[in-house]
C-alpha cells in the first residue's frame, strides 16, 4: 500500500514538473515575455518613488512615513503580478488551444493548479527581484530590511493572488475568451478597497468593514505600521492568513465546479484565439 502511494505521489510530481517545464521553456525562448515581466514593475517603482521623494521633502508627515509609497508599490506588485502570472500561464494554454488536451491527459486539475502556482512565483521573481534592487539603488529603500515580516507579507499576498487567479481562470474556461479581460483588470477592482496607499480610516465608515474582509488590507496596514511606527503586527498577519484560507478554498472549489461545467457544455474544446 505504501509503495503504491509513493508511486502515485511520484507520478503526480512528474506531471506537475512537466507542466512547469513547458511554461519555463515558453518564458526562456521569448525575450518579449521576459521584458514584460520587468518593464511595468520598474516603471511603477520609479514613478511612485520620485513622487514619494518629492512629498517627503515637503511634508512633515511623509518625511516621518518615508518609504510607504515605495513599499506599497512593491507589495502591490507582488499581489498584482502573482495573480497575473497565474492567469497568463493559463491563457497561454487557451491561446494555443492546448487546454482540452491537458484536461484529457493524466494531469489532474489540482496538479494543473499547483504547476501554475509555482510558475507564477517564477514569473514574479524574474520581474520583482530586480526591481527591489533598483529601489535600493535609486531611493535607498530596502524591502529586505523588513526581515521575517516580508515573509508574512509575501505569503499572504501570494495566497490572495492565487485564489483570485484560480477563480478567474475557471471563469475564462467556462465562458471563453470573452472573459479574458478579467485576468488583466480584476485586481484593480480591489485596489481602492485594499487601501494600498492610504490607511483604512481614510475610507467612508460604511466601506471600512468591506475593506477588512480582504486579506491584502491587513498586509498594507501591517506594512505602514512597520515603516511608520516600527512595529510588526502579527495579529494582522494571522487575520489575513485566516481570510486567505477561506478565499483560497473558495477559489479552488469554484474552479473545479467551473471545470465540470465546461466539460458538460463542451467549452473545453472551443477555447483559443
Please place each PLM-identified region on the residue numbering.
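Hydrophobic transmembrane alpha-helices and immediately adjacent juxtamembrane helices
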Residues: 1-273
